[in-house]
Amino acid sequence: MSFTIPEGLAPEVYPLAWLVGTWRGPGFIDYPGIGERPILVEATFSADGGPYLLYEATTWELENPPANLEGDIDVVALTPGQMWTRESGYWRVPPQEAPGAATSTSGDDQPARTELEVLLAEPTGHVSVYLGVVQGPRVQLATDLMARTATGAEITAAQRMYGLVNSELMWATDMAAFGEEMQSYSSGRLQRQT
């Protein structure tokens, strides 16, 4: 994996530097009560000099889905349909003074494991706090807190995985919602646009 650390990026978030940029690509949602549908996701990780990354993502239903997610896909040619959801928030490495906020190696020739906190808000009436780790070009997250407004859907827990594979950002989300147990909700692959 070769990349350049963006100018002005706070040292605290160097373990997340590989995410900085705009990513776009197809995926699928498949969950009880929702059914299966192709989606288009665009996610942006940016920095403003603070000890965090700014994060924004928009998900649309996909107008012209590829036959499958294998092989080359021209993500610029994908057409967004109706917006499905948006989310925004902050990805941060906890201060080293914080209890449990350790950066450690996981063994010889393994990238360091760095603890991570992610705070997200959605216009559907949800806010969530995820805790997890970044290890090289891989992120594992699980909700520590989920809150909703009186009209927000009942989502009780979620897990996310992000990984850089062959220069593409693979992602998957599992969730427990609508009385269902934790299970796969969505997944896809994103290509770096900037």
Task: Identify the residue ranges that each predicted region occupies.
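Hydrophobic small-molecule pocket/channel-lining residues, especially in calycin-type beta-barrels
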Residues: 1-194
